[in-house]
């Protein structure tokens, strides 16, 4: 046990620093959003003037360095949240270019890559293209730049986590490099990030390095293990508004959607998310170090970001 703790001690100290930074930032987000007890009450019916719902959007927008956010309990999963964002932004004949290879399993059917489900992106005439990863699972930046320059896609799509494959997850540095390449090769392309499992594990946010819109799940990091369900979309205000029109109806957007008494748990989840996410990260680092000592090959290594 002592040996296992000593091995990754520098990494654990680094995570503690990230944890403290993001927790203080979340506290500031609550202050900036003016969160108070009355925001914990729910609404019914149409949900007009649900001040708690609106304050929660402001909290996540601040925490993620975004212009706006759409945080709702009725996002059923991360895949559902991503699908709403994709349909909110893309139109028939648009092209979505994945620069991190094949997306993970659950989003493929929504795109139209697997199965023949009605209502997929493919069903609506939206095109999907991708740039394969290198043999070692890292991003092929040269190929990405060439494809973006040639195709000028409506959307450049980045998947941050490894999903269900064995490849490195992306840090903000890789995301920043992809954003720089995209904005230089095709300034009008919208950069979208699947940020599932990527919240609060670094000090630098994807929005601050060039991402235009991102989405994730409250069932994972962003809900702090307290949010019972839900998801979020955050980014540029006009893009978030487009996604809100897809979630509800054009014209009403973020103005409707009863919270049904879920606000309190969602606020609690947001508050604890920076702490809980880093505790989970420390557990993963410890487990990786332990099994490496026992002679196992581990991925990711305890020393990886």
Task: Please provide the spans of the model-predicted regions.
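N-terminal glycine-rich, Lys/His-bearing helix-loop that initiates the first secondary-structure elements
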Residues: 1-33
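Active-site loops and adjacent core secondary-structure elements that bind or stabilize anionic groups
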Residues: 5, 300-305
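Conserved PLP-enzyme active-site core in the AAT-like
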Residues: 6, 26-32, 36-39, 47-48, ...
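Active-site-flanking structural segment that lines cofactor/substrate pockets
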Residues: 40-70
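Generic structural motif recognizing short loop/turn segments at the entrances and edges of beta-strands
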Residues: 67, 124-127, 305
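Early transmembrane hairpin of solute transport permeases
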Residues: 72-74
